Amino acid sequence: MTFPAFLSPDPTWDGDSTGGPLLLTVRFSASIPDFPLDIENPDITTAAGLKQLIRTHLPPNLSSHRLRLIYAGRGLEDATPLSVSLKLPPSPSRTPVVQEDATTVKGKGKAPIREQPRLYIHCSIGDIVLSDADLAAEAAIATTLQQEQADEGYTGRKKQQQPPPSTTSAPRGFDRLLSAGFTPSEVSALRSQFMAIQSVSRTPDTMPTGAELRELEDRWMDEGSSAMAAGVPGGGEGISFADDDGGFGAGSRGAMDDMLWGAVMGFFWPVGCAMWLRREEGVWSWRKGLAVFVGVVINVAFGAMRIMN
């Protein structure tokens, strides 16, 4: 089995720029056991290079399939170095701390050596088989050094041909996942689920669209669903799924208010609520509408009990 060329030390790369290898453990979605990988040059090795290395450990029938690398809930972009994608700390903190002197000053014995923990990378193996051209394109961006060499090759031609500046804005929201290997249909399905979550606690006229929707998607991808559930401390204008998912858990700050006011309105003002809902459809969220219905049922129950007694 041959290993990709980018794993061997490059004479043009300064080896002192990193403090040690990056220890990874690859976990597959298929029934393939985990295996460890040591990346010698994480500052120049990209996610595409990691895919090339993973392919050498896969069975022959899976080595050409499309791979997706996920770390901490985010897809790794092929052309980005691992040190940037994984948000690694500076190199001195990644290396094991080994003391030069075996004994401490006051005769306390040998100091323990802290081993560097391994990072877990989830690898999803798709059903699509990549062509030779796709595999060659993936290998071409295996390291940043190869990208720099390719850039130097056509720098002169770019100077001669001055194209007009592109007005296309950078992808925002879930469109950023397209560069990580997701298909347009998968991005569309994810956006549909996100809109369904938002529609639970929003009326049709307050649903986010355009730039506001992309901003919500960016915030969800950057901060993660756990951070969104925790809310934004110190401000009342932050958007979080805990406030807007329409749930009834302890994390929903507006759930109790909606249930209380909805039940009170349904109990004391059932006819007015019915006329209001008839004239302005979608004025309440699903949660408050359910609370109003509960209040009306309680009103009817109390009236029936009074008539029977």
UniProtKB/Swiss-Prot annotation:
Pfam families referenced in this protein's UniProt entry, alphabetically: Dsc3_C, Dsc3_N
Keyword terms: Endoplasmic reticulum, Glycoprotein, Membrane, Transmembrane, Transmembrane helix, Ubl conjugation pathway
Residue ranges crossing the lipid bilayer per the database entry: 257-277, 289-309
Pathway listed: Protein modification; protein ubiquitination
Broad class of the protein's primary localization: endoplasmic reticulum
Glycosylation sites: N61
Subunit text: Component of the DSC E3 ubiquitin ligase complex composed of dscA, dscB, dscC and dscD.
Function: Component of the DSC E3 ubiquitin ligase complex which is required for the srbA transcriptional activator proteolytic cleavage to release the soluble transcription factor from the membrane in low oxygen or sterol conditions. Required for growth during hypoxia and triazole drug susceptibility, as well as for virulence in a murine model of invasive pulmonary aspergillosis (IPA).
UniProt protein name: DSC E3 ubiquitin ligase complex subunit C
Gene name of the record: dscC
